[in-house]
């Protein structure tokens, strides 16, 4: 029974354990010696590839940047030219529009000008009158009228009455502005008494005689000087 137990459960001595450990270490050392240089070579190849890729990227970077800058400059120049063309066209259009508006305004002003009338002058005086509010006569205040005057309405309507609803006729001074010149008034009587025609003739002849006497006196003096 004891032999079977020993054959079934094999005992390992310390020597066998040491041998197995040394064999495992030698196998690991052999693997390290065989596969170590290969791994190092593969890692060095990978680092070289990565460095070459980086160099290529670094070389391509400035070239692409220069190309992008050139493209941006070309686009900016084209946009500036188009904007300048648009601005010039707009300025030309505005100039032509202003010229057309100026000619139209001048025509309208020439057509809408009305002859100045004394009634309008009176309205302007009444609207923009000067009133003296001080006792010394130095302070004048410029007043503007808010309501339209009746004279202007009458002048525009052309009716002979003051108001259309009333039957009161307009005074002659307003209807006929120069009524005094149109009337046949008697001649003005002078304050002093008028002289007769005889007196006027006598004065005329006396003046002539005095002139003749003066001429004779001057001729006599000239003759005496010659002698």
Swiss-Prot record:
Pfam families: UPF0688. This is UPF0688 protein C1orf174 homolog. It comes from the Eukaryota. Residues 1-122, 207-227 are annotated as: Disordered. Keywords: Nucleus. It is found in: Nucleus. The keyword Nucleus applies. Residues 77-104, 113-122 have a biased composition (Polar residues). Belongs to the UPF0688 family. The keyword Nucleus applies. Residues 47-63 have a biased composition (Basic and acidic residues). Signal peptide: none annotated. Transmembrane segments: none annotated. Its main location: nucleus. GO terms for cellular component: nucleus.
């Amino acid at each position: 029974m004891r032999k079977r137990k020993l054959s079934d459960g094999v005992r390992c001595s310390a020597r066998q354990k040491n041998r197995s450990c040394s064999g495992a270490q030698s196998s690991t050392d052999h693997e390290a010696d065989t596969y170590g240089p290969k791994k190092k070579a593969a890692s060095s190849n990978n680092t070289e590839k990565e460095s070459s890729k980086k160099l290529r990227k670094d070389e391509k970077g400035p070239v692409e940047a220069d190309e992008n800058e050139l493209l941006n400059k070309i686009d900016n120049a084209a946009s500036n030219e188009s904007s300048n063309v648009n601005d010039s066209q707009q300025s030309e259009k505005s100039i032509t529009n202003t010229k057309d508006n100026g000619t139209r305004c001048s025509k309208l002003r020439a057509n809408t000008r009305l002859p100045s009338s004394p009634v309008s002058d009176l309205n302007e005086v009444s609207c923009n009158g000067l009133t003296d509010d001080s006792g010394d006569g130095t302070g004048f205040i410029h007043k503007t009228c808010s309501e339209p005057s009746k004279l202007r309405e009458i002048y525009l309507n052309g009716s002979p009455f003051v108001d259309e609803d009333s039957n009161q006729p307009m005074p002659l001074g307003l209807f006929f502005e120069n009524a005094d010149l149109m009337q046949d008034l008697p001649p003005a009587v002078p304050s002093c008494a008028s002289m007769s025609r005889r007196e006027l003739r006598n004065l005329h002849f006396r003046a002539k005689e005095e002139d003749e006497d003066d001429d004779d006196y001057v001729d006599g003096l000239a003759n005496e000087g010659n002698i």
